[in-house]
Amino acid sequence: MSSSLKIASTQEARQYFDTDRVVVDAVGSDFTDVGAVIAMDYETDVIDAADATKFGIPVFAVTKDAQAISADELKKIFHIIDLENKFDATVNAREIETAVNNYEDSILPPFFKSLKEYVSRGLIQFDCPGHQGGQYYRKHPAGREFYDFFGETVFRADLCNADVALGDLLIHEGPAVAAEKHAARVYNADKTYFVLGGSSNANNTVTSALVSNGDLVLFDRNNHKSVYNSALAMAGGRPVYLQTNRNPYGFIGGIYDSDFDEKKIRELAAKVDPERAKWKRPFRLAVIQLGTYDGTIYNAHEVVKRIGHLCDYIEFDSAWVGYEQFIPMMRNSSPLLIDDLGPEDPGIIVVQSVHKQQAGFSQTSQIHKKDSHIKGQLRYCDHKHFNNSFNLFMSTSPFYPMYAALDVNAAMQEGEAGRKLWHDLLITTIEARKKLIKAGSMFRPFVPPVVNGKKWEDGDTEDMANNIDYWRFEKGAKWHAYEGYGDNQYYVDPNKFMLTTPGINPETGDYEDFGVPATIVANYLRDHGIIPEKSDLNSILFLMTPAETPAKMNNLITQLLQLQRLIEEDAPLKQVLPSIYAANEERYNGYTIRELCQELHDFYKNNNTFTYQKRLFLREFFPEQGMLPYEARQEFIRNHNKLVPLNKIEGEIALEGALPYPPGVFCVAPGEKWSETAVKYFTILQDGINNFPGFAPEIQGVYFKQEGDKVVAYGEVYDAEVAKNDDRYNN
């Protein structure tokens, strides 16, 4: 396997070795593409910089006096080239080349290493995929453009499992299982499964392995639609819902502290199944969002302590996190770092959507299983059973580059180097928040305003990256406006860069006279080349990963400050939102930016939008269950459905779940009756589409028809008359 690693050398040290490799200047290098560093012994800045990466790069120090090198520097040096003795540039070259090869061998994880070796062999293919290394694409102009756009390597790495050299990804053997075992060690799991198809596929795998028809499932109402669909609609689990928070800004909060009370949970379970509610462990599975889309992250140790004894298994859906165990102050949020699990505790499953904020191609995810402490018990799900479900959803034609991305991700998180990546990110984003707070007044980072008697922005950055006090949701604090949080229950995920926009009084949580709805901010940023993750009401979210740099964050801050100035000056809308204005000039002709802000803010205010959004996830306002989600799914498959307009849908049983996307959380689940609250909320969305073209959200499970000059929303509901007269199922 040929190596592409370079050698980083200072100018003075370059004369003391020969090499056929590319040599780059060690000064200013980030050392990610080099296999060795060569410097004079007194060039300690270079030696220290290489050591600070924690990559373990071999450093060669050239010296005329080996005795003069300090003990501290010796710890950072791999080998000394001693000029006191007669040096031989060729010998030095061999030593350096050996070190580079050994280093590369150590940094490449098992599957990716094997994939590189396999591709380098240039085998003649007569198997799948049909493009056979990209050669088919090269025979047509469109195909050639496609081939050239992605580059040769990705096509040559798109392989078929007809050759078992890389191991079978479905039965977990060879380099494939070696990669999963390596990831399990990195993440502190008993077993790890690499999943293609996103965390939706991972959730399908977990729930189909654990939930059978009729099982009780303790269910976080914030769960992603994939969990509703797989655990309830497909597997037949019966939900016991836990109510969750929304605040006036539109941020998604965690489960109410009171809902973790055992007595209350058993009372809720008794309404679904009085007998099972009395069992030692009423629930086959609990599914909890470890971190919400909007950065409320749980103390996982407390969750297990409070509800673990009621459940055979707990699945922590960690789609929006996964990095918590690599950040010291977040360790308590990692279910995989609970080290005192015993036979009475639940099995732990953690699903991670690696592609969201870790290093993975889109659709890469992984399942971590930590349940050896219940091995031998009837509730234990062994590998055979779990892999049976894995194979139900895993393609027999996996995309090997995606699998390799999961392998490389684990390598990147490992050890000191991985922890440093996340620490450096924290420093970058803390500094960015400070700059925005000090330079602007309109868009406020969603963090505590005061910590330990000092303004948040006046804290010491290094301390803030290690002290959870700066991120804690204090019980009852006005700044976050979440109700029902307990002491030390939740904190802000520091890797969610969340901003609030004007329009909500932070003291009362009420609407103010003027506001800037976040969708306006999001559209402005997109017009200026910056893509946020999502926005809702008066909140906007940016996902932070180790990809961020100070320059990148400064570009974001600059555009936010520019928008603030434009709003303060009441600039023409045509100047502020050119794309939306051009597409809807008849509607917005002559508008200024403040006029649009005012109209949209008043629309949300007059409809009391955040109140209805909040109620959707409160037990008092949960839709009544008309049939089980599994039954609703069966009725929909049988075509026992009818399309009903929103203004006539209240009380009808939904056969499809309805939700805005993002965040992908059902407001009405399959089998639930459309409630007054749900109808009102989706009516607000419908009216927003009609009144403010260009700002339409993506909505799933609700269908829109153009009727005259208006868009009208419809939903698929149960048609009892059709079901009654369907002779296929009434014999």
Curated annotation (Swiss-Prot):
It catalyses: L-ornithine + H(+) = putrescine + CO2. Pfam families: OKR_DC_1, OKR_DC_1_C, OKR_DC_1_N. It is an enzyme of class 4 (lyase). It comes from the Bacteria. PROSITE patterns: OKR_DC_1. The keyword Metal-binding does not apply. The modification N6-(pyridoxal phosphate)lysine is found at K356. One of its GO terms (biological process) is amino acid metabolic process. Its EC number is 4.1.1.17. GO terms for cellular component: cytosol. GO terms for molecular function: ornithine decarboxylase activity; pyridoxal phosphate binding. Induction: By ornithine. SUPFAM superfamilies: CheY-like, Ornithine decarboxylase C-terminal domain, PLP-dependent transferases. Its cofactor is pyridoxal 5'-phosphate. Keywords: Decarboxylase, Lyase, Pyridoxal phosphate. InterPro entries: CheY-like_superfamily, OKR_de-COase_N, Orn/lys/arg_de-COase, Orn/Lys/Arg_deCO2ase_major_dom, Ornithine_deCO2ase_N, Prn/Lys/Arg_de-COase_C, Prn/Lys/Arg_de-COase_C_sf, PyrdxlP-dep_Trfase. The keyword Lyase applies. CDD domains: Orn_deC_like. Belongs to the Orn/Lys/Arg decarboxylase class-I family. Dodecamer. This is Inducible ornithine decarboxylase. The gene is odcI.
